[in-house]
């Protein structure tokens, strides 16, 4: 077997060892996984979902073009004859799209070059930033000077920006000054989801929701966005060094958002695979992505991700800081952590998770817990506090952290280091003590015009979930809440995307602004590409269910379009309206693979004779034809019953036999 080494240039056009023998196992080898990821990104091009097209809704200026996906629908057959059928068109359905250029068939993304700098002019025209002559971080300087890393480095590194002396460049600062930024206008258009384009009365129908105090205007304006940001109820993660990102907002008075976690570890994954996961995540609806890398080449991996990400990127800086001290938590210090913040801020990280609420006096509160401290960042800081017997440097230097964030517009995601790791530990003293401290830190961050959101649990049974939301709103001053699930039971490893999706839907309804996805691999291993998709689909369902329950304007349009297509047996439209068209189509075709199955007025669940919707259609048609009010449904049902008996007692009919019968 060849001993030719793996191509060491990540993402290079040169393929990985062409002579490498494929693995004979059912599970791909590490080499095969990396090769597959490289092929994916080397052949990457803008791709739309089936029967969808990319549209751009324009704003008040030429450089505001908000991407949407528009799902094209087939017409409804009204009647007529075989030779002269009568159809009624169905209007296309616009939907929120996070995929950036990767979802535009006209785009030709090149990961080696990175995405276009959408926000560069907006940032420049505010005249409050300056390009640095070099990087500020000592660690970054060391990496740049290491020629041995040239083969890993993103080639087109931009010069970092920073606020001019005496200036603050955060969206919160602008909002408080009464300024409506292009980012805010972009967001207002995006949040409305093009629903003003929908004319059909059937599609616009919606049940009233229960918003639990959320304010959901019928039309979201740029001024409303500004007001919500100024009040601290919403954030726009938008580092000035990540101009490639498309503006989005996180707040309970907006659509519920979903975050996807990616990142390498000490034992698995490569730069290629993480870039692939990024693109994959945005395709399946990730509103933000957190890079939680803990393995080798964290700095270089993050650069590739940022330069190719159309969504905000978050990190947990303490993870990288710990790598710099070889995993010894006691050796962490403020100087090293500060340097890590500068490193990541100048790369373009949009929000930092900071576990500044883990105080020394709170650690003993966890002693009687069933599962102790399960947050990685929380356990690191707890160990540091106990080792030094003092408050953490994150807490002691929090104002300095805010100064750094204000200079780059990095939002703070105040981490819940003492979140419960089992339902038994939910809502305990330690959890809420930390939450109250996070509320105090929120006010400090706001003094520096730094945007803030609050992280939440975790593992919480259903009956205890709402208290988490009410406590956060009260003690954290309505700052956006961002939760991991919560998981509602602990008995389902391998299915924790389900157990947590239940809790996510509930807390999203109660007011949580962003849900951090959980994949099937939670508690078991690092997720792969398919796990990422499963987690995202589950959480997009949870977020959408929460929007419906809150009564978010226009949230029901897609549901109504799906129901109409289902009732009219427009199978292709049903597939295309689904969150996951590929899976919907595949499941249908398992039992009805013929093309005739795509037009049949039944599916394999009930067959043609017991399809409730087909029966209902026939009853409706009969009532209309009779033009009588003499209980048409009962009469129709009786006649349908007689017709079914006359056709025989078979439960299932083939698609071909049904079509033959209908053509008579």
UniProtKB/Swiss-Prot annotation:
Cofactor(s) needed by this chain: [4Fe-4S] cluster
Key words of the record: 4Fe-4S, Iron, Iron-sulfur, Lyase, Metal-binding, S-adenosyl-L-methionine, Thiamine biosynthesis, Zinc
InterPro entries named in the record: ThiC (IPR037509), ThiC-associated_dom (IPR025747), ThiC/Bza_core_dom (IPR038521), ThiC/BzaA/B (IPR002817)
Gene3D superfamilies recorded: 6.10.250.620, Radical SAM ThiC family, central domain
E.C. number: 4.1.99.17
Residues annotated to bind [4Fe-4S] cluster: 603, 606, 611
Ranges of Polar residues composition bias in the record: 1-10, 17-27
Protein family (similarity comment): Belongs to the ThiC family.
Protein name as it appears in the record: Phosphomethylpyrimidine synthase
Organism, scientific name: Pectobacterium atrosepticum (strain SCRI 1043 / ATCC BAA-672) (Erwinia carotovora subsp. atroseptica)
């Amino acid at each position: 077997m060849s001993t030719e080494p793996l191509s060491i240039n990540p993402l290079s056009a040169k393929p990985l060892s062409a002579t490498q023998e494929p693995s004979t196992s059912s599970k791909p080898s590490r080499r095969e996984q990396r090769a597959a990821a490289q092929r994916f990104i080397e052949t990457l091009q803008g791709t739309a979902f089936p029967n969808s097209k990319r549209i751009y809704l324009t704003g008040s200026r030429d450089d505001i073009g908000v991407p949407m996906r528009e799902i094209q629908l087939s017409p409804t057959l009204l009647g007529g004859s075989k030779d002269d059928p009568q159809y009624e068109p169905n209007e296309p359905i616009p939907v929120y799209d996070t995929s950036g250029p990767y979802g535009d068939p006209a785009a030709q993304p090149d990961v080696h070059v990175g995405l276009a700098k959408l926000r560069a002019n907006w940032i420049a025209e505010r005249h409050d930033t300056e390009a640095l002559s070099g990087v500020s971080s000592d660690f970054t300087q060391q990496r740049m000077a290491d020629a041995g890393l040239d083969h890993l480095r993103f080639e087109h590194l931009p010069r970092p920006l920073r606020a001019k002396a005496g200036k603050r460049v955060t969206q919160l600062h602008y909002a408080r000054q009464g300024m409506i930024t292009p980012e805010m206008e972009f967001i207002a258009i995006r949040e409305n989801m093009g629903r003003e384009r929908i004319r059909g009365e059937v599609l616009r129908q919606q049940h009233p929701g229960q918003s639990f105090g959320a304010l959901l205007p019928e039309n979201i304006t740029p001024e409303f966005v500004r007001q919500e940001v100024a009040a601290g109820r919403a954030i726009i993660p938008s580092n000035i060094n990540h101009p490639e990102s498309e503006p989005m907002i996180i707040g309970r008075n907006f659509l519920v958002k979903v975050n996807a976690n990616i990142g390498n570890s000490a034992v698995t994954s490569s730069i290629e695979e993480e870039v692939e996961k990024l693109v994959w995540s945005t395709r399946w609806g990730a509103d933000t992505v957190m890079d939680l890398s803990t393995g080798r080449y964290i700095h270089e991996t993050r650069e590739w991700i940022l330069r190719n990400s159309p969504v905000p990127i978050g990190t947990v800086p303490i993870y990288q800081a710990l790598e710099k001290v070889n995993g010894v938590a006691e050796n962490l210090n403020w100087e090293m952590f500060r340097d890590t913040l500068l490193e990541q801020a100048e790369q373009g990280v949009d929000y930092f998770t900071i576990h500044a609420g883990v105080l020394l006096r709170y650690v003993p509160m966890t002693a009687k817990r069933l599962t102790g401290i399960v947050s990685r960042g929380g356990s690191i800081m707890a160990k540091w506090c106990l080792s030094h017997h003092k408050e953490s440097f994150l807490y002691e230097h929090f104002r300095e952290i805010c100064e750094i964030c204000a200079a780059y517009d990095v939002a703070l995601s105040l981490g819940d280091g003492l979140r419960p790791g089992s339902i038994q530990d939910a809502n305990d003293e330690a959890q809420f003590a930390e939450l109250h401290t996070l509320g105090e830190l929120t006010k400090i961050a706001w003094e520096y015009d730094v945007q803030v959101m609050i992280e939440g649990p975790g593992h919480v049974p259903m009956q205890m979930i709402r208290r988490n939301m009410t406590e956060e709103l009260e003690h954290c001053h309505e700052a956006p809440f961002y939760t991991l699930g919560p998981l509602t039971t602990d008995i389902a490893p391998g299915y924790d995307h389900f157990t947590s999706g239940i809790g996510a839907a509930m807390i999203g309804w109660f007011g949580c602004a962003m849900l951090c996805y959980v994949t099937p691999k939670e508690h078991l291993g690092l997720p792969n590409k398919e796990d990422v998709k499963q987690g995202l689909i589950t959480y997009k369902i949870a977020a959408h269910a929460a929007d419906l329950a809150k009564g978010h304007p226009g949230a029901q349009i897609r549901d109504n379009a799906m129901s109409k297509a289902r009732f009219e047996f427009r199978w292709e439209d049903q597939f295309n309206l689904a969150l996951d068209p590929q899976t919907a189509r595949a499941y249908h075709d398992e039992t009805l693979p013929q093309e005739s199955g795509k037009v049949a007025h039944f599916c394999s669940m009930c067959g043609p004779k017991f399809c409730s919707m087909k029966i209902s259609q026939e009853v409706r048609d009969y009532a209309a034809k009779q033009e009588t009010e003499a209980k048409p449904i009962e009469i129709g049902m009786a006649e349908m019953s007689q017709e079914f008996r006359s056709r025989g007692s078979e439960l299932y009919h083939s698609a071909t036999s049904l079509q033959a019968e209908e053509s008579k």
